[in-house]
Design a protein with these regions (language model features):
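Bacterial N-terminal signal peptides that target proteins for export
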Residues: 1-9
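Bacterial N-terminal signal peptides
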Residues: 8-19
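Boundary at the C-terminal end of the N-terminal hydrophobic targeting segment
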Residues: 20-26
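C-terminal catalytic region of ATP-dependent kinase domains
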Residues: 67, 90, 176-251
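ATP-dependent phospho-/nucleotidyl transfer catalytic cores
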Residues: 119-162, 200-206, 210-233, 239-240
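Canonical protein kinase catalytic loop motif
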Residues: 169-170
Length: 251
């Protein structure tokens, strides 16, 4: 037994030296501090004290600094009531719904978002992701990260089509030092339109399998607090159009 134990330790050391340790998904969380801690971070966002608030950006969301020493340092809060703004249907509830769909698909690109009251108003509180960069100055990684990055972009396109999100731009995409993609600003997502916002030139087959496995019961349980019945049905209708388009892609 002792000899076997020593062999096992030696094997672990050799694999680590060769770079064949645990799967990359367990090594490259980077700025995604919420992965595997969804419920506790969601609850913290609902209840943590906001010790300093500042309004920023063109849409004037509120960035809250939370009491030091907690699970999360900052959050962003938007009180966008359901309605039409500048010609677009928007709602803070869509921010939460996008996170819930992300969770169903274990995509881990949309930061935790929950409903919360702040100064008597109800809105969406979302984890403020630290240590990230925008993509406008540096939109693509080096060769070593390129294949994984392209797979992430393919999943993003599939996700946007599923939730009917037409407003994707470099301005609402972030990445951390590990080139993990993080997606923001989904207040214009969902709705009842079933046209696909973006053309899919490639897909992530594993991610498509997750999308295909979604059921109406799963969507109802996760989204009925945030979306109307016809908006939930539109997700399934868009999935059918995705299926048709995917079948036409070259193999």
């Amino acid at each position: 037994m002792i000899r076997l134990g020593r062999v096992a330790v030696l094997l672990v050391c050799v694999l680590a030296f060769l770079g064949q340790g645990p799967p990359a998904s367990t090594q490259r969380l980077g700025a995604k501090i919420w992965v595997g801690r969804y419920q506790e971070i969601e609850e913290y966002l609902r209840t943590a004290e906001c010790v300093r608030a500042e309004i920023f950006g063109p849409d004037k969301p509120t960035r809250c600094t939370l009491r030091p020493g907690g699970l999360v340092g900052r959050m962003v809060w938007r009180s966008l009531k359901p309605g039409v703004y500048r010609g677009f249907r928007e709602s803070y509830k869509a921010e939460i719904a996008a996170y819930e769909v992300d969770k169903l698909l274990t995509m881990d690109m949309v930061p935790p978002s929950v409903e919360r009251q702040l100064e008597g108003n109800t809105g969406a509180a979302q984890l403020w992701v630290e240590n990230v960069s925008g993509l406008k100055e540096n939109p693509s990684p080096g060769e070593s990260n390129r294949a994984d990055w392209e797979n992430q972009l393919a999943r993003m396109t599939m996700f946007d089509n599923l939730i009917g999100y037409r407003d994707r731009s470099l301005g609402n995409m972030l990445r951390d030092a590990e080139w993990n993609l993080i997606l923001l600003d989904h207040s214009r997502a969902f709705g009842t339109a079933t046209e696909l916002p973006r053309k899919m030139n490639r897909i992530d087959q594993g991610f498509w399998s997750k999308i295909e496995s979604l059921t109406r019961n799963q969507l109802d349980a996760a989204l009925r607090a945030w979306l109307a019945d016809n908006e939930i049905q539109a997700i399934l209708d868009r999935r059918e159009k995705m299926r048709t388009e995917i079948k036409s892609l070259p193999r």
